[in-house]
């Protein structure tokens, strides 16, 4: 087993990581602990983080295992290849940095700056040693062209070979493919980032020396000082107003040497596990050319107002380093974009006279009420996400009163008596996870916990299993988040949302109801997604479902329909099953 390159600085809490990498400091603490799970954690470590990591070791390497098995976990000396290095290449540079950013001292630091660096250089040549699914370069432009009009992809699954050649499957290397344009600079906005893994991809794409602006959410020791070692990288942690809020958006901007750019909105974090055996979704914009210097201020907007909504969203970060990119977006032609930008930003928000509600589920309601074709009230609202928040004591508390009340909107004239549509929630069952490519570890991306689940037993009546045999992904647990309404009888999809937002009040917002004032939607997180509305994508009232219709491709749902409800003995997968 390879030694984690971050050593004592490792902050990961993902079981797959601990199944692949050893950690000498954790192994030493684990070996001294008793069978009751009591450990002496040195004062110089974060007690909470170390305890969580030890619980993962308990699950992966039970005490009843022989000492030899545990020693094998701790004594393996082969360090991980965090990112490859090529000497003498102007587009590569050196990646052998000390992840903590501190001065090298002692044996552990010495290993970080010498053994790891040497190992990286030895393994610099073969992309397949670093990236499990490698697609031939140069073909992404044609793949994107064939994906029109939806431009929506799922990530390739390492252990599902059919996805490697599926037309609507994609890898990170393909997103960076030169056939889409010669990249001169990029922006990555994401929650969790493994900078070594990301720069490895940049290395193989030949853009390691290009400027990268990285906005991240999850605390990351190696990102704190990456700029000292990689001057082309500017890493900024997004400051959140409350401790429980999350900068959860996953979005990329790719700037090309001809002045054009591209926007990618994703559900995947930027680390290996999320691009391995997990179902993720991405929307990729067309190429967005630069506008003429003398273009009008409002030129280059799409019919969906995507450009304005995106700029308003980016301004909310209040990060000066984004200003050149906001200016670049303003000076780019977004008219080819056929989807709506759908964002969430922290704070309290009220309806405006021009844009309606600006963020969260209320923004989605405004767009649906204006543009969605009339929908029969019997058509369910189908939700799907990789985590579930605290939703209240019953289905009425937030799901119906707030969330479904927004997602039921359409352009039916006001005044008609409407009913609350059915609510369905796709979330992997225990059996779904147990049968996944990674077994129980496949649930590492599903952080729904027992404490929350115990408070909302009513939810099980609405749960649907994860099934995706049509897309070869039934065994690839979903980290994708999607929301839609479709009619199986006439094989139609009314609208579809792909987003970073899980089913939670923090992501979508919760109304503070006060009869004396206009309701205020309180949102905790940054989130970003896209809304597909047929009138803007295909010119029809609905998308085809299952088969093409009059030359219009079927909408590529990420899961099988009809849905499969939980059986009486099914139960949702809970993260506690991994943590003991």
UniProtKB/Swiss-Prot annotation:
Site positions for Interaction with DNA: 504
Chain residue ranges for the region called Disordered: 65-117
GO cellular component assignments: cytoplasm; nucleus
One Pfam family from the record: zf-CCHH
Keyword DNA repair: yes
EC assignment: 3.1.4.-
Stated role: DNA repair enzyme that can remove a variety of covalent adducts from DNA through hydrolysis of a 3'-phosphodiester bond, giving rise to DNA with a free 3' phosphate. Catalyzes the hydrolysis of dead-end complexes between DNA and the topoisomerase I active site tyrosine residue. Hydrolyzes 3'-phosphoglycolates on protruding 3' ends on DNA double-strand breaks due to DNA damage by radiation and free radicals. Acts on blunt-ended double-strand DNA breaks and on single-stranded DNA.
Protein name, as recorded: Tyrosyl-DNA phosphodiesterase 1
Species for this entry: Drosophila melanogaster
